[in-house]
Each structure stands twice: as C-alpha cells, then as structure tokens.
C-alpha cells in the first residue's frame, strides 16, 4: 500500500503535455473553454498519486469504454487515495484525473459540450479495482454466490 510520503516523492513531469491539442480546454473541472493546458493550475501531489493508482490497476483496451466517464472513474480513484493517505488526499478534480489518465497513455474521447470524457479503459480492470480495493463490498447470501470475476483466473491483468 502506498503512503502519502511515497506520493510526495513521485515527480512525473506533466509539463510535457502543455500544448497538446487533445488537452485543449482542460482545467481542474474538466474540459471547459478553449485555452491550452496550463499545468501550473493542477495539484502535483494529486496528479502523481492518481497516476500511480491508474498505472497500478487500470489497463487500456483498443476501444473507447463508454460505460464509465471520467467523473465516475475519478471517484473510484479518490476512494483508493483516501484510504491510502488516511484522508489527506480525499478529493481529486475531474481535470486532474483526465490529465493523469492521459499521462498513462489512455486515449480521450470527448462528447460535444461536456466537461467529462471517456477512455479506452478495460471494464475488467475497473471491476478488479472496485472489488479488490474495497470500493464495493459484496456480501453474498451463500459462500458460492461470489461474482465470477472473483474466481476468474485472468482477472489479474
């Protein structure tokens, strides 16, 4: 389990994404406006921590996944970070999450006039993160009623 000190020592250079056309209009709240990305508006601790969780658990796929948008995914990562940092990092912005996903190599798919976006992220890796990091607690009636994902030999990506 990572700690706050671990995240403080991470030092990924997010400034390399300034000027990226696919990030035009990205601010902390998400895609709003038309200005170029200004990395100084983002919290580096939150960016590095979110990036670490993403790299550890989420996997890219060929197609864009329209089941979960950036806003819903950022809540999952927030939950993990709140647990790992004892509540010090308990909120990350939508824009921070989007930039962290982009820095991990995920493609962005935007919808017109929406501050949220979708990514080419594996549903299986999202489910793995939800179940195995305690975001969703499953309490079956009988011990044999666990979802098949928990018994799948290929769930570890």
Regions found by a protein language model. Give the residues of each.
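Generic secondary-structure transition motif, activating predominantly at the C-termini of alpha-helices
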Residues: 11, 54-58, 62, 81, ...
């Amino acid at each position: 389990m990572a700690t706050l000190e671990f995240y403080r020592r991470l030092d990924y250079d997010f400034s390399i994404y300034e000027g990226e056309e696919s990030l035009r209009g990205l601010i902390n709240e998400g895609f709003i406006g038309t200005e170029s990305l200004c990395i100084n508006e983002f919290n580096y601790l939150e960016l590095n921590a979110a990036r670490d969780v993403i790299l550890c658990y989420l996997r890219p796929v060929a197609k864009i996944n329209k089941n979960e948008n950036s806003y819903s995914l950022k809540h999952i990562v927030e939950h993990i970070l709140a647990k790992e940092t004892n509540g010090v990092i308990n909120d990350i912005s939508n824009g921070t999450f989007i930039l962290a996903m982009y820095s991990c190599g995920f493609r962005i798919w935007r919808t017109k006039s929406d501050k949220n976006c979708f990514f080419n992220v594996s549903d299986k890796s999202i489910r793995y993160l939800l179940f195995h990091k305690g975001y969703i607690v499953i309490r079956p009636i009988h011990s044999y009623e666990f979802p098949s994902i928990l018994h799948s030999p290929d769930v570890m990506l």
